[in-house]
Amino acid sequence: AEAGVSSVLGQGGGVEEVLAMFFVNELCRIVQGMHEAGLIHGDLKIDNCMIRADDVDEWTSTYAADGSGGWAAKGVTLIDFGRAIDMCCYPPDQRFLADWQPGAQDCVEMREMRPWTYQADYYGLASIAHCLLFGKYMDTTCYVNDDGLKTYKIQQSLRRYWQTDLWTRF
């Protein structure tokens, strides 16, 4: 059975933090595997994530990252590879520029018309995590330090009872 990840979001809020961690962990593993194979999805967003919740005879209540105990039947499947890029077809130092009008869902490099590669997927992962936690799309604010270095931060505050160290580093 599959459903869109966005369908599990509550009204006005996200999902429980532990469920968000599970989905984000699964997505990180998928994206890491894709990147190791030289693939960029290019359009990671919550609408392109499907929940994988197949029935299993025995399913342990303790998560097993290796998929044992029925966990291989639970997780996330990515869809919509319309913007995918096979980096094996390009020189190792190849970078890209957006040839469309980038929107808020696109990475900062695209919006600022700067070269990008895997940043598109990392921004997408952060955006999905944000949507799972807060129940809405990510808005960022740009800060420029005295040296001209830009940093971007989400506009929402993390809840004090969340694993803030984990999410801040993410």
Task: Give, region by region, the residue ranges found by the protein language model.
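Helical subdomain adjoining the active site within ATP-dependent kinase catalytic cores
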Residues: 112-116, 123, 127, 133-170
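Activation segment/activation loop of eukaryotic-type protein kinase catalytic domains
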Residues: 47-108
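Short, flexible/disordered intra-domain loops and linkers
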Residues: 7-11, 94, 140-147
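Activation segment signature within eukaryotic-like protein kinase domains
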Residues: 23-24
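Conserved structural core of kinase catalytic domains
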Residues: 1-18
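Eukaryotic intrinsically disordered and solvent-exposed regulatory patches
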Residues: 35-36, 61-65, 126-127
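Hydrophobic HxD+1 residue recognition
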Residues: 44
